[in-house]
């Protein structure tokens, strides 16, 4: 009845089905892990953004690597901007995906330590080899607020470090490198400034990090597992159809043989 399953065509089809089922199950498990990872990241970012602001020195210190639970925490700092030694970070985009610079300004705290402040985005008006015109920050002693970020690395950001850049231009924000350049005690990580709010021609401040689309991974997980469940069902439907077609063909042959030959 089902001897046709031993034919070359059906053996190949069955082997393909047997390979597809575990592959699709594994893809579903991978999407499940992606969903859990993105959900955990979204929860971590949300709790950090909604936590009460704290002084930056409560979380950061010289040489300290900002942890995942500290990242995006709102911090405050009181001191003065050192615009004479500020730099720009190349190839950064704004909310409209326009390429420009981020303005990186050392902020000297009241105790003499320095924290790096990313004041926001400015357009790249002019040659990339020249230092752009940067709107000045508030003069004198000021209190700022922003999100604490970890030092940037090529591994984490995908941005390659480039040697021999024009003066006062960098590719990555790194507190250890800035400490050597400034000859100062620099806190680990940096601040993405959110207050005072940008006014007039001030740099465009960086918006809050968006949440990752975790539900999409959940939908893909369900989709792959439905595909995995559908493979044996589809295989069985094809088997039943093949059996029915063969039985109908055999019945027609018997009918033709039983009919009397014309006189």
Language-model features, listed with the residues they occupy:
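Phosphate-centric recognition/catalysis
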Residues: 65
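Surface-exposed, charge/polar-rich loops and edge strands
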Residues: 1-60, 68, 73-115, 119-263
